[in-house]
């Protein structure tokens, strides 16, 4: 059971980061128009999320995100002994994903990003992005994996545009994107603040979810 879940989370997380980073590199290679680059990156990520969640939901629940796993544990959706399995798979999968994306475009496997994303406003944006993601997942969870997949995909698509952080909303993805000096990269100087914001956003969502949404 653990092996099955590890593999599901690992593959899903790897493909998620390949989609995010790879589409960003492709867009960067094809145009210098920032809006067009972001649009291409957005569409690929939204489409990828929908397919990945639908494909892997029955294997592991398709978290691909330590913040999601944390909230799933606190709402008794997964057992304590699965936390390490999930989070390790997510981190390792995301790291493999960024290396493969870099490799496919003939870039160094690992290259620290120089893309600075500073500011308290961005911290708040990332907190809001993660809060919204968790809230939407639990708002649609009882409607089935297709509903969750569609909701998450369209929310992240919107999040790329309405948040100044471009809605990472995922600590494992934020960490992985430190290792690509391309359109979707983030400087290691800013990664910790993103991760802290994401954890706070997830915990705030958990608090609200327990008040207004049945988690049984």
Tell what function each PLM region has.
Residues 1-216:
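Membrane-interface helix-loop junctions and terminal tails of multi-pass membrane proteins
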